[in-house]
Swiss-Prot record:
Lineage: Bacteria, Pseudomonadati, Thermodesulfobacteriota, Desulfovibrionia, Desulfovibrionales
Locations listed in the record: Cytoplasm
Keywords from the named record: ATP-binding, Cytoplasm, Kinase, NAD, NADP, Nucleotide-binding, Transferase
Catalytic residues of the enzyme: 65 (proton acceptor)
Catalysed reactions, as listed in the record: NAD(+) + ATP = ADP + NADP(+) + H(+)
Enzyme class per UniProt: transferase
GO molecular function: ATP binding; metal ion binding; NAD binding; NAD+ kinase activity
Cofactor: a divalent metal cation
UniProt name for this protein: NAD kinase
Plastid keyword on record: no
PANTHER family xrefs: NAD KINASE
The organism of origin for this protein: Nitratidesulfovibrio vulgaris (strain DSM 19637 / Miyazaki F) (Desulfovibrio vulgaris)
EC number: 2.7.1.23
InterPro entries xref list: ATP-NAD_kinase_N, ATP-NAD_kinase_PpnK-typ_C, NAD/diacylglycerol_kinase_sf, NADK
A biological process from GO: NADP biosynthetic process
Amino acid sequence: MHTALRSILIVTKSGHREAEALGERMRAWLAARGLSARVVENTGDAVSLAVAGQECSLALVLGGDGTILGVARRLLGSGVPLLGVNLGKVGFLAEVAATRWESSLERLLSGGVTVQERLALSFRVERDGATVHSGGAVNDVVINRGILARVINLDLRVGSERLGELRADGLIVSTPTGATGYSVSARGPLVHPQLHVYTVTPICPFLNNLLPLVLPGEARLSVTVRDRTNEVYLTQDGQEGYALQAGDVVHVERAPGGMLFATIEELSYYRKLKAKGFIKDQA
């Protein structure tokens, strides 16, 4: 879908002078063309970011994939589309190269913003019948062992159907956006970002008793921690963690509203896979 540009929020990587300077140049460039823009630093404060984004029609995020992920997670359900400007290394989530930002913004102004809705995840941790922790994820929700090199025991259920027990280093529940992250390193599948599905991939499963699964977006996954001797943690997008206890049940499902990404279609998904080394042409 397309949306008209009214005002723009520019979010810069925390403590990054290059990002701050570029943000100010962008603000001045947009102001010269009649658009209001505000520059804020990504401090990790979800409330202040949500307030800043209330009046904007687009959020430009200046940084690497980590910065883009953090901002995207805090904008879940806000209805504000996000466009990443790559100042990092991999830059798979970024649509715009920092060296070509002016031409990219010119395309935005001339054609409006094309918005793509992507599936995101919500989760909650149930302990003794009560919810003790909850949140959202743009890339993945991971349940993994602590510092000791021991497998952990998890019990998996999809809806009312029990899949069985998994003994592994952990489990990755990934969105299509996160399929090129931790999930693919654990032999999870590449998934087109426009598909409304999510994947379940074990990390080093003992005896390989569970292969990666692709679940419909409407499916609800429940993971019960059976381990009583090892440390077990839940992490969201590799950035925020929570210690789990034996008997905890982690419920994962599709987040309402999903995540909105703006696109200017400079590079197709398949060309991006090739450019980042996920597909290698042998010809």
